[in-house]
Every structure is written in structure tokens, then in C-alpha cells.
């Protein structure tokens, strides 16, 4: 696992390829330590990968625009790549948890880690601002830039039980046979216990109403260390200083 993690950190994606794509769509030059990820056309996560974690020979993958997690299995290399993962299986979050937002609303998962038989996941928790579009005039784009929204599922911090399926591969379940259950931090589509606590923080509180892309509050990573959670922040960056939150 440590070797896989180091290789993953070197990163990873000279290409993303679904089995239906032709080989001529792949880059002509492959980088050293490349890892090949193969996704079916039905996979919940196929692009915009934002988080990854290992369980043995399997790789859990999350994406910016998905409301679910895909599990890829380690396969024999088919070319010059160092590692290859495919044979995916999708796990919609709505089948595992009562979500704060709608079942089809993106969760923007940004951090994943495996600890004590659970897959921990965290959303960005950030607001988003509408972007300009080339086919709109200045007045329309000005209105778009003034619109700030929140997808409720972004405010998700949860742990999902990992259990071996009948095929011997790890699966995510709502409730495991040993009694472990999927759980999420208490809250709704507007806030949770984390955002309520941060709102009173002198450093981060003033940034809770600012979209993530504008240096607002924006979670980007997650580590479980015993009884502590370490949450990495993409923003805000304060005078060049980034931060970790310890829970």
C-alpha cells in the first residue's frame, strides 16, 4: 500500500481511458510511473478526479461532479504503465447515507482516507460562483458573476463501512454485518457542526460566505489520525499561509 500511495502521489494521470475509447486518443508520450485508470461508460466517476484512497488491491475514486464513489480493482498492466486499475463498481452516496442535499446533487468530494474499516470522505463545504460564458453578453455575464450558490451535499463529512463482498472484494455498505453503520456529521443542506464551529473562528469565519474559487472556505484533503481528523484547506490562504483544521 505504501508503494501504491507514493506512486499515486507522484501523479498519476497521463490519461483517463474508458474501454470504449480507441487507442489513438491516448497521448503519444507516456510519463514514467504512469498509472492507467479504466472506467466504464456507466461509471459515476470518469473525470475530474478529486480524491483517492486504497483498500488492499482496490482503489477508491471520487470526482468533483459526482455524488458517488467508484471502486477500481488492480489489474495486470496492459502496456508500459507501472500500475493499472479497472473493472470498476459504482457506489451512489444516496444508497449509503441520508444526504444533506438531493440524491443527484454533486457532493464535490475532495478528501478520502481509509481508517479502521471505514472510508472517510469530505466535501469541499464551499460556496460556488457562476462563471462567465463566451456566448453571453456583458450584462448577462455580470449577473452570472453576482450569483453565489451552495450545493448541500458539499457540506458532507462521513464515514462509510467497508465490508468484503461475496466475491472477496471490498464494498461500501450502509450497515456492516458486525454492526458498523455509515454516519455523517450532523447538519443539513445549509450548514453542519463543522461550518457552525468555523463560523465563529477569527481566522476563517469571515471567509465562510465567500466562494471557494475566490479564496473562501474550501476543504481539499482529509487524514484520520487516531481520534483526530486533520482537514486540509485550499482556502482561505492568509498572507500566504495555508492551514489544517484539527478535529
Protein language model regions, located:
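Sequence/structural signature of beta-propeller domains
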Residues: 26-247
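Intrinsically disordered, low-complexity segments enriched in small polar residues
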Residues: 2-5, 20
Amino acid at each position: 500500500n505504501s508503494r501504491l500511495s507514493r506512486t499515486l502521489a507522484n501523479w498519476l494521470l497521463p490519461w483517463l481511458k474508458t474501454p470504449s475509447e480507441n487507442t489513438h486518443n491516448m497521448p503519444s508520450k507516456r510519463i514514467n510511473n504512469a498509472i492507467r485508470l479504466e472506467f466504464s461508460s456507466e461509471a459515476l466517476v470518469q473525470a475530474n478526479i478529486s480524491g483517492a484512497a486504497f483498500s488492499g488491491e482496490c482503489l477508491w475514486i471520487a470526482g468533483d461532479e459526482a455524488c458517488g464513489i467508484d471502486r477500481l480493482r488492480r489489474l495486470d498492466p496492459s502496456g508500459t504503465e507501472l500500475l493499472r486499475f479497472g473493472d470498476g463498481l459504482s457506489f451512489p452516496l444516496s444508497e449509503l447515507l441520508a444526504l444533506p442535499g438531493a440524491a443527484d446533487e454533486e457532493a464535490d468530494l475532495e478528501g478520502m482516507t481509509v481508517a479502521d474499516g471505514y472510508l472517510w470522505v469530505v466535501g469541499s463545504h464551499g460556496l460556488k460562483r457562476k462563471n462567465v460564458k463566451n456566448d453571453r453578453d456583458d450584462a448577462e455575464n455580470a449577473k452570472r458573476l453576482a450569483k453565489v450558490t451552495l450545493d448541500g451535499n458539499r457540506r458532507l463529512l462521513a464515514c462509510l463501512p467497508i465490508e468484503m463482498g461475496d466475491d472477496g472484494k471490498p464494498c461500501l455498505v450502509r450497515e456492516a454485518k458486525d454492526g458498523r453503520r455509515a454516519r455523517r456529521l450532523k447538519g443539513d443542506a445549509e450548514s453542519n457542526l463543522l461550518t457552525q464551529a468555523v463560523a465563529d473562528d477569527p481566522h476563517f469565519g469571515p471567509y465562510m460566505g465567500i466562494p471557494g474559487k475566490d479564496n473562501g472556505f474550501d476543504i481539499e484533503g482529509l487524514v484520520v489520525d487516531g481520534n483526530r481528523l486533520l482537514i486540509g484547506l485550499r482556502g482561505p490562504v492568509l498572507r500566504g499561509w495555508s492551514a489544517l483544521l484539527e478535529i
